[in-house]
Amino acid sequence: MKDLKRKIHYWCSDTMRNKITGKGVVCAVLDTGITQHPDLIGRIVGWKDCVQGKKTIYDDNGHGTHVAGILAGNGKSGRGLYSGMAPEAQIFAVKVLNQRGGGKIRDVINGIRYVLLKQKEMKIRIVNISIGTLPHKKNPEDELFLFWVERLWDAGLVVVTAAGNKGPKEGSVTIPGNSRKVITVGADEELGKKYSGCGPTGDCIKKPDLAVPGNRIYSCNYLYPVRSPYAYIPKTGTSMATPVVSGAAALVLQKYPDMCNLELKYRLWNSCEKGRYYDQRQGHGNLHVEKFLECQEKILDTNENLLYDSTGDK
C-alpha cells in the first residue's frame, strides 16, 4: 500500500497533519463478507448476509475482507505498513457473493435494498461494489441490477464500482460499471491495461471514470490469525482498485461532510492526472488524492453527458 499511496499522491497535509482519515464516514461493502481481522476490529458497524442468512459476520472467500482492508484497514498487524486509504472509516458489510466469489443477481439486489433500508439509520455515505457481470442482450436481470444500483446513487450515496477484468477490448466494462451515474474504476499500470474493462459502453458513455493501480495490492488476509500466519496477502484486479477510490471518497466526505455525491464525482474528475492511455481505458486519468482533497472552488462546468470482476482476481 505504501507504493500505491505514493503513486496516487496520498501523502499530503490533510492525510499527514490534519488527521483526515475517513473518521465517522460509513462505507457499505457489497462482497463476499468480512472477518474480524485485527485491522478492522471495532469498525464493522453493520452486517447482512444475503446468501445464507447467517447473523454472525464471516467471509468464506476472502475477497470482501481484502477489499475492506484496502478501503479502511488501519494497518495494526503490520505497524501501519499496509494501512488502507481511510483507516478510521467504518464498514457496513453486506455479503452478496458465495464461497466461490460468484452469486445471484437477486442476492446482490437484496443487499442493495438492505443498504437503502439502513442508509439513514446507519448514516451510510459510500457503497463499494467490486463485482460485476458482462452485459447480455435483452436480459431483464441486467436491467434490474442496473436499476437498483442507480437507486443507490439517486438516494444520495456515493457509488463506486469496478470496470471489471474482461478487457482490454472496447465495450468490456461490466455491469454496473456501465452506468452513467456511478463512479467506475479501472486498473492502471502495464498489467492492468491487459485486463481492465474498457469503454465506451453500449450506450456510448465514456467509461471508466478514472484508473488506479490494481496489481498485487497487499491487504487483509481473511484467514489471519486463526488459519494463517500471514496478516496480508496480494490480490490483483479492478476489484482492488475500486476501494482505493472509495477510501479517497471517505477522506473527502470527512473533510466536507455536506458534499453531495454529484459534486464529489465532478471534483474527482477534475482532480485526476491525465493518464498514459486513451480515455476508454483510463477515463479522466489517474487518482490524485491531494488535489481531490483540496476542493477549493465549486465546480460548475460538469460535462456529465460526455460521450465517446469487480469480478475478482485476474
Q: Residue locations for each model-derived region?
A:
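Catalytic-core environment of secreted peptidases
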Residues: Q36, V45, D188-S239
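Substrate-binding/access-modulating region of protease and related hydrolase catalytic domains
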Residues: V96-S179, G202-I205, P225-T236, M240-T242, ...
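N-terminal domain-start motif of subtilase-like serine proteases
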Residues: M1-A28, V51-D59, L191-G199, H288-E290
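C-terminal subdomain of the subtilisin-like protease fold in secreted/lumenal serine endopeptidases
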Residues: K5, I124-N128, Q254-K314
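Hydrolase catalytic cores
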Residues: A68-L71, F92-N98, G214-Q282
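Structural detector of well-ordered beta-strand residues that form the stable sheet scaffold
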Residues: F92, V158-V160, T184, A211, ...
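Subtilisin-like serine protease catalytic core
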Residues: M16-A28, I34-G46, K55-R106, M122-R125, ...
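Solvent-exposed loop/turn segments at secondary-structure junctions
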Residues: G33-T35, C50-V51, S77, L97-G101, ...
